[in-house]
Amino acid sequence: MLSFLSSNLSNTRQSIAQVLNFALVLSTAFMLWKGLSVVTASSSPIVVVLSGSMEPAFQRGDLLFLWNRSPRAEVGEIVVYNVKGKDIPIVHRVVRTFPEVEGKKEKTVKEVTVSTPTPPNMLLTKGDNNLADDTELYARGQEFLHRKEDIVGSVRGYMPMVGYVTIMLSEHPWLKSVLLGIMGLMVILQRE
């Protein structure tokens, strides 16, 4: 009777240890992601290129590293932005910048002096592989992007083809289920 209790207690302890190890891995990954978000000032410091609109600069499946601490974006800079109402990051190049416009209906432009802080800039973007600019991609009635509101970050580095795994998982939902099942079995069957 005593041996039965000790074996059950041992199995229970081992199961709890496995669950805690799994929770530790998840929480560590979450903390690393949030820490990277704070350092880069970007809600999504790493993104995957989902289309071929930036070829030849970036291919579909490239993993991009973003930085969002610059107050302005310049012409030629590659930025990642989200369209209002949609949560799909778009990677395109800035082709034009505008000064902040006050009273658009009156067509007056705010005068910028040396003592005035740099106004937030507005951007027009375009994919390198696209024929037209992105005004058709922006939200209805939006003619440009606001640097602070719409930009997720500027591209500072990339790793080719590493993000293709993410694309495969989103295009083939059954593959995601298979991988999660295999990972779950590995956690359950792991013995220390």
From Swiss-Prot:
Q: Where is the active site?
A: 53 (charge relay system), 92 (charge relay system), 134 (charge relay system)
Q: Which GO terms describe its biological process?
A: protein targeting to ER; signal peptide processing
State one molecular function term (GO): peptidase activity
Q: Which UniProt keywords apply?
A: Endoplasmic reticulum, Hydrolase, Membrane, Protease, Signal-anchor, Transmembrane, Transmembrane helix
Signal peptide residues are none
Q: Which residues form a coiled coil?
A: none
Purpose of the protein: Catalytic component of the signal peptidase complex (SPC) which catalyzes the cleavage of N-terminal signal sequences from nascent proteins as they are translocated into the lumen of the endoplasmic reticulum. Specifically cleaves N-terminal signal peptides that contain a hydrophobic alpha-helix (h-region) shorter than 18-20 amino acids.
Q: What's this protein's name?
A: Signal peptidase complex catalytic subunit sec11
Give the originating organism.
Emericella nidulans (strain FGSC A4 / ATCC 38163 / CBS 112.46 / NRRL 194 / M139) (Aspergillus nidulans)
